[in-house]
Amino acid sequence: MQVSVETTQGLGRRVTITIAADSIETAVKSELVNVAKKVRIDGFRKGKVPMNIVAQRYGASVRQDVLGDLMSRNFVDAIIKEKINPAGAPNYVPGEYKVGEDFTYSVEFEVYPEVELTGLESIEVEKPVVEVTDADVDVMLDTLRKQQATWKEKDGAADAEDRVTIDFTGSVDGEEFEGGKATDFVLAMGQGRMIPGFEDGVKGHKAGEEFTIDVTFPEEYHAENLKGKAAKFVINLKKVEERELPELTEEFIKRFGVEDGSVAGLRAEVRKNMERELKGAVRNRVKSQAIEGLVKANDIDVPSALIDSEIDVLRRQAAQRFGGNEKQALELPRELFEEQAKRRVVVGLLLGEVIRTNELKADEERVKGLIEEMASAYEDPKEVIEFYSKNKELMDNMRNVALEEQAVEAVLAKAKVSEKATSFNELMNQQA
């Protein structure tokens, strides 16, 4: 076997391989012997068919199969010998083949980039220092009460946290537009569902009033014909409702799994959940900064084959989220996922190099801790932990999470890490 390697462009490689004629003939004869042992031909007992007849009947297909097998095996031998690490599936380009002659073919593929990590000492990470205060717990309790609130009709004017029922008709330059009209539309104020200025125009009005408001569609509005356009909405306000928050009664508190039904018990449970969320948020915030710094400090080429593979993964995930199938996933435009896919590949390659150079292996104690932390959010943590322990795929996924955390910590060990006092609300809003 003769082998030559050339760089086509960037990470592209072409390996040209020549297989000696005698190697091909030896392999063909060997395979024909195997065929002769199995084949049945009228007039001959199984295994007793003359080789010339076997060769005449099956020689062409056997030779084709042998060539395909030799091409694959010799390519593997070649990349091992040349210490090449292909990324993605190789493209075989067969040359002209004549029986009795050497056979030359080429294989085109991309290789993984050679990554040499630099600039870790220049990475700057700001670690949030946060504690859950009594005031934070008060806000969360208020949020829980709002989620369980009922609505009661009121006579007064609509304000920022009310719910209104309206009819409206929108127009641009005196002409109604598609999607600009609704009847008995229920709008919970303060959630930002409508275009800027709409809710402000409703505030201060009472049920039974009809009025007109002026608004401007944002430049980034999804409908091309309405972007940046001034519009008028004629609104008939039919009903105004205000929230009635439930009292912190024993019955209400027990809905959240607090068995003793006490306010103190609820506050303790809420604080515990907030602290768990906080721990994850701090970890994610630090991790995202470390990875961002790692990416900025290390500009690497990325094999297009890996990007293509990641795009397929993202397409399928998107289709699953919206109830689509395999065919619909493949029809989603490549451009929607290309940037995210490239980013994920880059991060994977860089963290992989961190893991390799630091000789990291998943810490089983960390894996156990991650599973316990995740399970604590469920009603029966022991059941969740047992489920994970019996599922190899889930355990492997959690080991990957742990290994990634360890890689990030290795980056942080060399980075410039400072601390910044932050409120719970500020940090959680950054995560949103």
Curated annotation (Swiss-Prot):
UniProt keywords, alphabetically: Cell cycle, Cell division, Chaperone, Cytoplasm, Isomerase, Rotamase
Stored Pfam families: FKBP_C, Trigger_C, Trigger_N
GO cellular component, one term: cytoplasm
Gene3D superfamilies listed in its UniProt record: 3.10.50.40, Trigger factor ribosome-binding domain (3.30.70.1050), Trigger factor, C-terminal domain (1.10.3120.10)
PROSITE patterns, per the entry: FKBP_PPIASE
InterPro entries in the record: PPIase_dom_sf (IPR046357), PPIase_FKBP_dom (IPR001179), Trig_fac (IPR005215), Trigger_fac_C (IPR008880), Trigger_fac_C_sf (IPR037041), Trigger_fac_ribosome-bd_bac (IPR008881), Trigger_fac_ribosome-bd_sf (IPR036611), Trigger_fact/SurA_dom_sf (IPR027304)
Single Gene Ontology BP annotation: protein unfolding
KW Cell division (keyword) present: yes
GO terms for MF: peptidyl-prolyl cis-trans isomerase activity; protein folding chaperone; ribosome binding
EC number from the UniProt entry: 5.2.1.8
Location of the protein in the cell: Cytoplasm
Keyword Chaperone attached: yes
Catalytic activity: [protein]-peptidylproline (omega=180) = [protein]-peptidylproline (omega=0)
Entry's free-text remark on domains: Consists of 3 domains; the N-terminus binds the ribosome, the middle domain has PPIase activity, while the C-terminus has intrinsic chaperone activity on its own.
Biological role: Involved in protein export. Acts as a chaperone by maintaining the newly synthesized protein in an open conformation. Functions as a peptidyl-prolyl cis-trans isomerase.
Name of the protein described by the UniProt record: Trigger factor
Organism whose genome encodes this protein: Salmonella typhimurium (strain LT2 / SGSC1412 / ATCC 700720)
